[in-house]
């Protein structure tokens, strides 16, 4: 599986510090990041402890089926890949529509678009200027704190490229 199950799911908050590294590299002060991520990690931890986290791994063991997941390494790869593409293409991109076109030029994004899962602009329009692009939400276990966007904006970030964005994150 890609998403964590069993012990890996219970250890989810151990990979959240990756979010600190990413945000700090974007110019957000570490004390601000820690203040925002700590309550989010505690919330995730509480939610996980109420879950029957080992059911899939237990079922695989009972059925004598090999089972593993590879979540963070895959997400790290996606993060680095997209950062590299953005760095290469940013001088030629000016608008959100340009970023969308670059993403759709990646075979996996093109295939996703065929299955009704194309990149979506959730704030702004295709003609909105890009500014500084931040690749976030690709790794680090789960979405970060919804209040991080103000700090990213203060660090000069104008555009967020994220894998998942909850309604609460969109509202911010």
Q: Where in the sequence are the language-model features?
A:
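Non-catalytic interface/targeting segments
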Residues: 3-159, 167-168
């Amino acid at each position: 599986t890609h998403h964590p199950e069993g012990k890996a799911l219970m250890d989810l908050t151990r990979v959240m510090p990756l979010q600190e590294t990413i945000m700090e590299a974007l110019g957000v002060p570490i004390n601000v990041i820690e203040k925002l991520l700590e309550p989010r990690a505690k919330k995730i931890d509480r939610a996980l402890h109420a879950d029957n986290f080992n059911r899939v791994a237990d079922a695989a063991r009972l059925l004598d089926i090999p089972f593993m997941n590879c979540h963070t390494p895959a997400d790290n790869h996606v993060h680095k890949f997209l950062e590299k593409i953005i760095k290469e293409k940013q001088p030629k991109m000016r608008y959100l529509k340009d970023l969308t076109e670059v993403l759709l030029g990646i075979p996996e994004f093109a295939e996703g678009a065929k299955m009704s899962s194309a990149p979506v602009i959730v704030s702004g329009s295709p003609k909105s200027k890009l500014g500084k692009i931040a690749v976030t939400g690709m790794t680090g276990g789960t979405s970060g704190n919804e209040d991080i966007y103000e700090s990213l904006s203060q660090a000069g970030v104008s555009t967020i490229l994220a894998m998942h964005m909850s309604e609460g994150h969109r509202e911010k």
